[in-house]
Amino acid sequence: MVRLQKAVMAVGMFSIFEAILQDRLGSANGFEKAKHILKDSSNFSLLQKLEDYKNAINALKHGKGRSYEYLVGRQPNLDFRIKLPHEIHFNEGDVSEVTILVDVDDNFVMGCARVIEEVSSVLRTEQPHILI
């Protein structure tokens, strides 16, 4: 149950952040607009982290698909664990584990929060007229 609660929290955080980006950046796709701002300001490392976490959230919401395949290709470079196609469990015998493709532990939830805060900070610097 704890892992499921963490997954719901992470998905909720990113969903609310996306809604805020859409509203404040005046864009139907807030993440794309934010990614352009990160790229234009040469924040490539943060851009990559945003893309990784955005795809992880999509894999949590939708299961296997493009976002999951993206994560499988990036697996050695991710800040969090994903369940690889040949894996059944993250930790066999862990009764708190739920059937999801991303290991949503404290590290993952805090990573989501850090990415949101860091992206917000860059947006406030690059677009000072926007309140995020």
Region spans (language model):
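Short, contiguous, well-structured surface segments enriched in hydrophobic/aromatic residues
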Residues: 1-31
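Short, solvent-exposed segments of well-ordered alpha helices
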Residues: 1-8, 44-47, 51, 103-106
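Short acidic alpha-helical/loop segments enriched in Asp/Glu that coordinate divalent cations
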Residues: 22-37, 67-74
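Histidine-centered, metal-coordinating catalytic motifs and their short helical/loop contexts
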Residues: 44-72
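Polyanionic, low-complexity intrinsically disordered segments
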Residues: 66, 70-132
